[in-house]
Design a protein with these regions (language model features):
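N-terminal beta-rich core of secreted/periplasmic extracellular enzymes
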Residues: 29-199
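Bacterial N-terminal signal peptides that target proteins for export
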Residues: 2-14
């Protein structure tokens, strides 16, 4: 008796799996493949500038350009020595002992990193670094800045004008603190609701 029940369950499972496979196969075949996307056209002026700069960089500089260090673990001297391409102000890594700092402290740090990155001592050419930060819902590491709800909450408002205004305010606060780049907006598709950005 158990053998018959087992075989029926196996047969049902195979049948359901076959239906799912056929459904998924048909679904994916109706989708436009990513390969149909065309890359953006190259800008000849930018390409010429790249062709001029690359031969002037040492191997060490080229390696440094693809490294992003966290500002809490490096100094301006490190930026110059290793010719870093970017510095991340990661979570809770503001200048100083606190997880946030005032605009003056941020600018002092940003300027020190920038000046170190453009120092041409010992190299033919220097490339300015990019200072990045996680400001997905406001500049939480800037004293006095506005921190907004996370993107999932903002999306739930269904108000693109509000979200645009929040982005404008965040961009202003990042500029005031010397940052060039934020890792935002984010489109998160969590597979596990325990992940912090799923709320």
């Amino acid at each position: 008796m158990l053998s018959i029940i087992f075989h029926r369950n196996v047969a049902r499972t195979i049948g359901v799996a076959s239906l799912i496979f056929v459904s998924c196969s048909n679904f994916s075949s109706n989708q436009d493949p990513w390969t149909s996307l065309e890359p953006l056209p190259l800008d000849p002026a930018i390409e010429a500038q790249i062709d001029e700069i690359l031969p002037k960089l040492s191997l060490e500089q080229k390696v440094g350009q693809v490294i992003q260090a966290d500002n809490a673990s490096i100094s301006a001297e490190d930026v110059k020595k290793y010719r870093l391409g970017s510095v991340l102000s990661g979570g809770n890594s503001a200048p100083g002992p606190l997880p946030y700092a005032d605009a003056e402290s941020w600018i002092e740090m940003a300027d020190a990193f920038y000046m170190a990155s453009i120092d041409t001592q010992g190299v033919e050419i220097a490339i300015p670094l990019i200072l990045g930060i996680d400001a997905v819902h406001g500049h939480a590491n800037l004293e006095g800045a506005i921190v907004f709800p996370h993107n999932i909450g903002l999306g739930a408002t269904n108000n693109p004008d509000l979200i645009k205004e929040i982005a404008r305010i965040t961009a202003h606060e990042l500029t005031v603190s010397g940052h060039d780049w934020t890792f935002a907006p984010t489109l998160a598709v969590p597979q596990d609701l325990r992940w912090g950005r799923s709320y």
